[in-house]
């Protein structure tokens, strides 16, 4: 919580870990977006990113849901992404992140649009942030079962985010997911044949 940051040497001494080993860990945490590094002369100072915190699940899902929506409506992108990463590092279930945090946020931002509290431009920005949050979940390494395959299609542009969330939930459950996005412009008399042609390529 230090506002001035700590050097790698200070951190390694406090944790009683070899300095070189500690540096490797610090670089990994920085790559994950949990820490930021500032060079001052020959010294590297390390700071925790905003939003970095240890959570306890399942009791903290409601707390995270509230924070996520608060940060989302304040357009605090980096803090939101750190929040999702923190959930992973706090051993949250990926499926629960989607059902307890992401999906409620999707429905809530559409409610804000319906109530006239935000416009289309702001909705697009908030949806992009939610979509990026979903991609963080998709980046988590999961061993997929070659026998479990699913194609996810969005019926219109309004349900694209929901289809992305559904795709991510299948992914976290070990499915090989083919997410086609909004297919409404492609639905015509030849759509069934087109889809069958695609399916023969992947299955």
PLM features: residue spans?
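C-terminal regulatory/effector modules of DNA-binding transcriptional regulators
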Residues: 116-119, 132-203
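Short helix-capping/hinge SLiMs at alpha-helix to coil transitions
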Residues: 1-4
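Acidic, two-metal ion nucleic-acid-processing modules in DNA metabolism proteins
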Residues: 7
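Short phosphate-binding/catalytic loops that engage adenosine nucleotides
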Residues: 15, 34, 174-176
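Residue-level marker of alpha-helix boundaries and capping positions
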Residues: 16-17, 157
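Long amphipathic alpha-helical segments
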Residues: 17-138
